[in-house]
């Protein structure tokens, strides 16, 4: 039967049709090769936007630096980074006038957090630039390496201390004449394989000590490593993102804590909240503008876009903002917060891996590392790359480029939001003192501007004034990419507003389906995604039921666990059929064991094991949840786990799901190929670390430590604890005399070994 598709929309309000416009099927684009070119683009563009600033030279590192602050006011619409200090300070003052006490309260909250935060805060986060190895590492490893080096250089670094104490060490490290670090290197040699008699390359990892003088250390401490941003849709060109090292991270964290606290108190801020809370907050601002506009007034909304937000922001401006916000606070607090922007004013961008060259005729490939770009003959490069390198050369030092202006992506999202909101705040009638007024929403570089005025000329004047005010603080609204419409229809941070925020369900489509973690987690994540979309994204009951059936089908095909009574033949069907026949209560079998699906849209919140527990055969229960089952590497499973789901737009989201430990919650083993790389030493360190921590937690089950505090104290603690426990157990008759004697002997041996060492 032919269906006329327009009939489907007869009863649907126009705004609900947004889900049919979904363009993002298929995989997003990923980047390959080096990010060196993109990073050079960023550095060159940033300098171009500030080119009329003043050049100075950093006395410590010798890096040339460009300072556009209080530079010439722009004469055209080109993006520029010439923020005016007095304008920024005035915007801050007006923001405080509109929200009495906001800065002081936020400072008090932050001060409390600064004094309580422990150093492990820095282990959160993904890849981090590890200055000791000069490349990226997982955050925890980078922190451990930094602390190790600090300690061997006579600083008091302590892994379980306060973050503020670690930051004191960072400050001291910058005053040292030199720092000694341990780096990893690899040796390659050709050997003959005994088995295959072929020649193979063997790699061995060595560690060597290296001394960095003050200048080299400072360059590394101020370095941001760069990578290419992956999985960005709707862009032809890739772009670079930055990852700072451990010296900068702690300071940035405190600044962002302060800014977050301020953003929470500003109704125009789209950060730090998200989801429905954000929609409610934003809908409020729109409602306010609609109700306050008299019947005769016009109201227009701009769906705004800023040109190169990060590259025109300036850390020196952030320093001015922080100086103002904390002006009534104690000296130590002001100092701690001002270090991050100062470090960013002196930052260096690491150019990444360099360029790959290949000669098709000679079948040769060679890599030109970034360090060589300063001296290599440019005749090997094509024209566009040659231009980039020529432009960046004056800024190069040791494979990094001096980048004083600009912020790099994702660094001070909260603080830059405060700056944006301070301009929106100036739109109140009592400040504009004319017939037009504005308000709006700001979330990092994304904004929506609502302008009210008696007539079109007033609207135009309001927009112009907003545009020019933004220019004064280094914000460049893009006239080409911003769109104005009658208030009631606009887009902000991928939320579409049409008389209320419209649920764009299609955005969530990529996160439906089977993740491939393990049978247990996948089942749980799958139903949670459907449940969440019923709550948040207008996923109706009929569609949800269909999504559920499709999910179960997908799940069964992924794990080849079709029902025990099916005709489908897979590699697993023999075992599953046998299990089906032996099971009395077939409804109790999990779907992953060939059982029926008992989920419907009413019970999505119950983990499958709980849902079927009463229906299971007793011996099946015993096998399924047997912690001693030798085939399962049981990690300790928290009652709630986190999964990463990929919506179509925006960053990967973390989503909670219920975790029940069964024989299906297996953990895949680590890929062996890492054992042949330079990461191997790190892997071994990590495993040692893990073993020590596990052992420690066995002795101190209530241990709130996550990591050892200096090796000696740890061993001593465990030995003395073992002795106490053994004596108690012996006296209460839980262990025999021989066992007690043996434990005591082992303890003495350990102490003896430590003395000899």
From Swiss-Prot:
Keywords: Eukaryotic host gene expression shutoff by virus, Eukaryotic host transcription shutoff by virus, Host cytoplasm, Host gene expression shutoff by virus, Host nucleus, Host-virus interaction, Inhibition of host RNA polymerase II by virus, Nucleotide-binding, Nucleotidyltransferase, Phosphoprotein, RNA-directed RNA polymerase, Transferase, Viral RNA replication, Viral transcription. InterPro entries: RNA-dir_pol_NSvirus (IPR007099), RNA_pol_PB1_influenza (IPR001407). Gene3D superfamilies: 6.10.140.720. Residues 55-64 have a biased composition (Polar residues). A motif (Nuclear localization signal) lies at residues 187-195, 203-216. It is found in: Host nucleus; Host cytoplasm. GO terms for cellular component: host cell cytoplasm; host cell nucleus. Residues 249-256 are annotated as: Promoter-binding site. Residues 50-82 are annotated as: Disordered. Its EC number is 2.7.7.48. Disulfide bonds: none annotated. GO terms for molecular function: nucleotide binding; RNA binding; RNA-directed RNA polymerase activity. It comes from the Viruses. Residues 286-483 form the RdRp catalytic domain. It is an enzyme of class 2 (transferase). Phosphorylated by host PRKCA. It catalyses: RNA(n) + a ribonucleoside 5'-triphosphate = RNA(n+1) + diphosphate. Influenza RNA polymerase is composed of three subunits: PB1, PB2 and PA. Interacts (via N-terminus) with PA (via C-terminus). Interacts (via C-terminus) with PB2 (via N-terminus); this interaction is essential for transcription initiation. RNA-dependent RNA polymerase which is responsible for replication and transcription of virus RNA segments. The transcription of viral mRNAs occurs by a unique mechanism called cap-snatching. 5' methylated caps of cellular mRNAs are cleaved after 10-13 nucleotides by PA. In turn, these short capped RNAs are used as primers by PB1 for transcription of viral mRNAs. During virus replication, PB1 initiates RNA synthesis and copy vRNA into complementary RNA (cRNA) which in turn serves as a template for the production of more vRNAs. This is RNA-directed RNA polymerase catalytic subunit.
